[in-house]
């Protein structure tokens, strides 16, 4: 007998999809990106799927596959690749201190720009670009929507609007909220 939560876990299959890791090089750094898209299709709308602090794990990959099943080219980049493996830390406090707080916002924006360029060159239609993210990734949704005017829609799942400004995270979503043009 499984706990109720385990009984309701969604596990989207790969049938009809190309779903695998691709490597995108950003300023000399190889960034792993989980890609899911309908097999043999091009001119696909593009959705960037941004993880919470735990990185690209099975749930994030599953979300990408769900979007692919709906006809999207979904990309979930490992935005912490330079800082370390989020799964290697025993507590959230350690993870925040050693990995998340060390990921500079400009680096994250560059990585996402590179994902968009890769999508454009690999069957994606970036005139139909969206972004969604969870918790830490929700914050990134706000920032990237302000950064890239090509974003047509953004959905932040419980992303923080306010936070401590640091040299690596100098702007918070509340600072740019009034200027956003993206729904």
Please give the residue ranges for each predicted region:
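Serine-hydrolase catalytic machinery in alpha/beta-hydrolase-like enzymes
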Residues: 21-124, 169-173
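Conserved hydrolase catalytic core segment
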Residues: 143-153
């Amino acid at each position: 007998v499984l706990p109720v939560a385990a009984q309701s876990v969604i596990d989207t299959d790969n049938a009809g999809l190309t779903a695998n890791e691709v490597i995108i090089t950003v300023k000399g750094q190889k960034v792993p990106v989980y890609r899911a898209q309908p097999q043999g299709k091009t001119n696909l709308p593009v959705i960037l799927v941004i993880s919470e602090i735990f990185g690209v794990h099975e749930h994030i990959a599953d979300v990408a596959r769900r979007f692919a099943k709906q006809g999207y080219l979904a990309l979930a980049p490992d935005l912490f690749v330079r800082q370390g493996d989020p799964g290697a830390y025993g507590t959230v406090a350690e993870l925040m201190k050693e990995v998340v707080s060390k990921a500079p916002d400009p680096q994250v924006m560059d990585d996402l720009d590179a994902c968009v360029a890769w999508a454009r060159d690999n069957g994606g239609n970036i005139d139909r670009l969206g972004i969604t993210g969870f918790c830490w990734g929700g914050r990134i949704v706000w920032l990237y929507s302000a950064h890239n005017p090509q974003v047509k829609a953004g959905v932040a799942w419980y992303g923080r609007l306010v936070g401590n400004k640091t040299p690596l995270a100098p702007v918070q979503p509340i600072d740019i909220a009034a200027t956003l043009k993206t729904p």
